[in-house]
Amino acid sequence: MSNLWIFGFQALWSPIFLLFMFSILIGYFLIIGPYRTRFENATKVSKKQIFYFTTGIVLLYFVKGGPIDLIGHIIFSAHMFEMAIMYIAVPPLLLLGIPVWLYQYITSFKFVQIVLKVFAKPLIALFVFNGLFSFYHLPVVFDTVKQSQIAHPICLAILFFAAMMMWWPMLNPLPEYQTLSDIKKLGYMFANGILLTPACALIIFATAPLFATYTDSAAWMKAMELCVPAGTLSDLNITGPEFLHWMPVVQDQQTGGIIMKIVQEIVYGTIIGYVFFKWARREREKDKEQLQELPPYLQAK
């Protein structure tokens, strides 16, 4: 960690991104707090929802604004950890942290309705996110995007939007947007796991370095300009990422693929469990209601 300080505070902690995340968090607490009365049918937000949303924002800053983002430009396994948290773990936390009445307000806008109608359909959301994620990690695409000051943030924003749309059919609480039954939700998550496997397998089982931005000095220096001021880079006597490598490049690459798969399995497994137990609880309540409707002598039996 001490070696990273040579890149400066701005590269390590991204103060502008921190301010942006802090602004979102303040806005959230203002909306669910003093401004809640301005929304129709607004009720008090549970501590669980506040925890979910706050954790999502903190995690997003941790991987995108903290040292993880900088390390991810030097070590591929750190990059994959960043991607896993940002696109697999953060979106469900944010969605679970938004109250129903705020969803109702947001979806009252025609533009939002059109976006959800087009991009949040389960099959479209499923294939768009997993397709974009796999396409992004094709070596030629990855290296090109990583070296572009314009393409990189645009691609990350598109991926994040696609991730939110992928999670929408699973976790939104609005009856009018419940396009999947509980059993279909389980199948949806299993399909997500299957579709993401080829991209992970390509990286895990590769026997040679795939990405020039982690092996070629010129490509790496260009990629580092995304998070380190150009003036700082020119003053440093660094020729490549080797000074921070603690494992061979191929092993680091394979570790990155494994990390992505592990995080994906943990999060998807947790959501599958969440959906299953919610479904089981509803079925038990339904059985109790049906039992209460029976005559007393049949209930005893």
Where are these regions (language model features)?
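Alpha-helical membrane segments of multi-pass proteins
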Residues: 1-301
